[in-house]
């Protein structure tokens, strides 16, 4: 699992109010360490700002056409099971979401990046580079405030009786039942989303075609599980393993 927060041991202290650069927008104090509130960054800023600036420089210098941010959202969050797109990519993202919904066996919508909400990848990458910026959100009950005990099991199975109960009371923006949202389903949504983004882009931009082979799709992940596509660390040389 990734984490978009900079450690306070590496970036301290937090300000009373976080003032986003370069917009000057006031954000919550803790978002000063939030990677997805610090785009486009600056070379002499905080650790988080320098990190996002490095991403931006890579995108600009390498001439990246499409930047994809893969995220998961709690079911109590309204922006879920969707593609969030910069206005430069509205038609493109809509075609991707329509194709996924029609062919892949899961529904995914389209949301447009708010022009006045700053620091997010889908806003700032599109504003400060040539790239079309997309963000894909998959459902993740592990993140919900109404969940029960936090455990690796909840992370992997996506099952939680308290989140199910919240859904029965109309408190969720995505459906859930006792089957939950297993990690294979969530990963499969993302792999299919990336693959379809590549295919749709290549169909429309033959001169800038992207070639990618062997990407497992949603149905493959649901059928085989995530572990099927990963190397077994138990069989790896100890010199190749890193523990954190």
What are these regions (language model features)?
Residues 1-90, 94:
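Active-site/substrate-binding loop(s) of hydrolase catalytic cores
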Residues 10-20, 103-116, 142-160, 241-244:
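Hydrophobic transmembrane alpha-helix bundles
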Residues 23-24, 106-115, 177-185, 237-239:
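Noncatalytic linker/hinge segments flanking ATPase motor cores
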Residues 58-61, 99, 103, 197-204:
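Structured segments of extracytoplasmic/periplasmic soluble domains
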Residues 72-142, 147:
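Active-site-proximal helix/loop segments of hydrolytic enzymes
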Residues 117-215:
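Active-site-adjacent mobile loop/cap segments within catalytic or ligand-binding domains
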Residues 217-244:
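Acidic, Ser/Thr-rich low-complexity intrinsically disordered segments
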């Amino acid at each position: 699992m990734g984490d978009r927060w900079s450690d306070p041991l590496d970036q301290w202290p937090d300000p009373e109010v976080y003032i986003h650069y370069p917009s000057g927008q006031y954000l919550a104090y803790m978002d000063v360490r939030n990677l997805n509130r610090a785009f486009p960054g600056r070379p002499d800023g905080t650790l988080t700002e320098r990190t996002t600036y490095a991403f931006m420089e890579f995108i600009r210098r390498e001439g990246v056409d499409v930047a994809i941010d893969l995220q998961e959202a709690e079911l109590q969050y309204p922006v879920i099971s969707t593609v969030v797109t910069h206005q430069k990519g509205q038609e493109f993202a809509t075609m991707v979401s329509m194709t996924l919904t029609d062919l892949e066996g899961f529904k995914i919508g389209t949301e447009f990046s708010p022009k006045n909400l700053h620091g997010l990848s889908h806003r700032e990458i599109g504003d400060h580079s040539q790239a079309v910026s997309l963000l894909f959100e998959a459902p993740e009950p592990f993140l919900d405030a109404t969940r029960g005990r936090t455990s690796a099991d909840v992370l992997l199975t996506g099952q939680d009786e308290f989140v199910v109960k919240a859904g029965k009371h109309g408190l969720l923006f995505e459906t859930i039942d006792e089957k939950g949202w297993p990690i294979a389903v969530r990963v499969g949504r993302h792999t299919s989303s990336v693959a379809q983004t590549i295919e749709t882009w290549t169909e429309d931009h033959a001169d800038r075609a992207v070639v990618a082979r062997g990407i497992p799709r949603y149905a493959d992940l649901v059928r085989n599980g995530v572990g099927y596509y990963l190397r077994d660390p138990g069989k790896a040389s100890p010199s190749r393993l890193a523990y954190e």
